[in-house]
Amino acid sequence: MSTNPKPQRKTKRNTNRRPQDVKFPGGGQIVGGVYLLPRRGPRLGVRATRKTSERSQPRGRRQPIPKDRRSTGKSWGKPGYPWPLYGNEGCGWAGWLLSPRGSRPTWGPTDPRHRSRNLGKVIDTLTCGFADLMGYIPVVGAPVGGVARALAHGVRVLEDGINYATGNLPGCSFSIFLLALLSCVTVPVSAVEVRNISSSYYATNDCSNNSITWQLTNAVLHLPGCVPCENDNGTLRCWIQVTPNVAVKHRGALTHNLRTHVDMIVMAATVCSALYVGDICGAVMIASQAFIISPERHNFTQECNCSIYQGHITGHRMAWDMMLNWSPTLTMILAYAARVPELVLEVVFGGHWGVVFGLAYFSMQGAWAKVIAILLLVAGVDASTQVTGGQAAHTVRGVASIFSPGSRQDISLINTNGSWHINRTALNCNDSLQTGFFAALFYVRRFNSSGCPERLSSCRKLDDFRIGWGTLEYETNVTNEEDMRPYCWHYPPKPCGIVSAKTVCGPVYCFTPSPVVVGTTDRQGVPTYSWGENETDVFLLNSTRPPRGAWFGCTWMNGTGFTKTCGAPPCRIRRDYNGTLDLLCPTDCFRKHPDTTYLKCGAGPWLTPRCLVDYPYRLWHYPCTVNFTIFKVRMYVGGVEHRLDAACNFTRGDRCRLEDRDRSQQSPLLHSTTEWAVLPCSYSDLPALSTGLLHLHQNIVDVQYLYGLSPAITRHIVKWEWVILLFLLLADARVCA
């Protein structure tokens, strides 16, 4: 038996390291420390055919062409960690168990899961797994699975479109940032707060409890378009607006508490970025905004009516205020930059260790943009406020509305069996629009309105009905009670249909809301141009509410002088509807239900309970509106502009408090550079520029201000939405499909 030691296996430790000849993909090599060019042959990376003289040389191993492969992380602490597709594997095993073939179908190179990332993996796993399961169904599995696969591909195409729309940045790093940016940059066009006083609703600037986002000791974050009103032991106090969604209890009372929150946010964002879990942190940050409950530190109410009557504002004052407040970009940047040296000392000695940690970490990483963002964020929440001016003085001007007496015809009201109509001697139903019927409307000089009080006695005020609540419903089966008359604003008309022209006296007016005259046709809709001379002449009035249909409702007069109406289905504002106590709303009934707008519930000429559309035959159809005042109106319905006149029942002595104001959804015309013309004792739900609040005139009921002065404070402060955006940016949130 040999005593020689057993030969050891060669490893890296017991092998002498000698310089090896290094070969390059192009054919060159290093021999003795000298690089030798390739002998001959094609370009880089292609092996040339040896010549005959070279055949005897040993054949070397061809080096593979180097490829740029994507680095995929294999551990949680590295970026690019792939999400585990447990749902996908589970669907695969479930399909294998259910499959009559015992095999799993293949998607090939077009598998949507190959292109999905992050949240898209979850969506595509569900859609593709569902398609796999459908393919395993016996007999019908092939067609059903094909349809399911097509749907999965469609979902993938939709996800790709969302990714493209949210930005084509590498890795889709800023998709959630851009989506959050779009969600908080836009301010609602109509952010009017509504208060419920058990008997009715009315508009106010006071924030409701649902509008309060977060409460601090001396500051409040709230939704735009309102001002917090606090009831402090019986004393009502309006807080001071600092930004459209930040209010403070007193000037300068803001910075300390908000700085603490920003300190924690910077610390959390830095940790998320360091651990490469920005995706999860960003999703948690966004979702937490919907579930975190703010501590109740104050007793907020809606009894102050803050900033409703702030006084008259001239055009010069508006221009000066715009220069001070609407162009603060350069001033804000300079103010932030000037505070950076001071912040360096204050951050260290003030104990803002979260900010210090974030600055140190991102500085070592070379992320100077994030360092600047942190400094600007801290500079924003640490800035002070300063007073720049006071309120403009109140001015009083007289009523400038033009009162139109309307037409004064030889018309009398006749009561027949409890129903009111005009006298037949005033009618000339055979006249057309170009003859005496139209001319007599304006030039006959006398109207006997002695029967109007009795005629209008069956009409009720809006306050006489019960308040509404819940979801609106349409009443398609309208049955009119005995006390309901078509000349009352609350009269719910029956659905429009086909009306025989023989029974109609004069033209038929329909409202889009602009008044239009409907001509006679046959039942197939072919115009006849005979104005009811033939038995087959009819008015085709059936239509749906605009913008899907032609008009809201129609009004005409029959041959005996009675007013007839038809219209779209009115709105039922309560589920427990009672015909005696409740209202079927055919107009804008805002004070009884905030959702009842004219566009949703309008069923005729009545724009509000006080105002109806003015048209040439208004005094024939509604003779008791002879003393109504005429106002100019501009409305947009389905993108189409309507300019019309409205006749309103309002006089100087009528009460007009906030709870008495109706809503008129219109695009008001201008009285001046700062004043809108609205219907009397109403308001437009378009808030004022710069404040987002309602500003009404103290004494004149048909004026609303289009521009409101801010509470005389210039502010340099970051909104809470921007704090969330900076957190997403600092944490590298990438939540895209």
Swiss-Prot record:
Topological domains, Cytoplasmic: 2-168
InterPro entries: HCV_Core_C, HCV_core_chain_A, HCV_core_N, HCV_Env, HCV_NS1
Region Interaction with EIF2AK2/PKR, annotated ranges: 2-58
Region (PKR/eIF2-alpha phosphorylation homology domain (PePHD)): 664-675
S-S bonds: C429-C554, C452-C459, C488-C496, C505-C510, C566-C571, C585-C589, C601-C624, C611-C648, C656-C681
Region (HVR1): 385-411
Cellular-component GO terms for this entry: host cell endoplasmic reticulum membrane; host cell lipid droplet; host cell mitochondrial membrane; host cell nucleus; membrane; ribonucleoprotein complex; viral envelope; viral nucleocapsid
Span list, region Interaction with DDX3X: 2-59
Region annotation (CD81-binding 2) ranges: 546-553
Domain of life the protein comes from: Viruses
Glycosylation sites: N196, N209, N233, N305, N417, N423, N430, N448, N542, N558, N627, N649
The protein's name: Genome polyprotein
Residues excised as propeptide: 178-191
Chain spans, region Interaction with APOA2: 122-173
Site (Cleavage): F177, L178, A191, V192, A383, S384
Gene Ontology MF terms: RNA binding; structural molecule activity
Region (HVR2) residue spans: 474-481
Keyword Cell membrane listed: no
Entry-annotated residues carrying Phosphoserine: S53, S99, S116
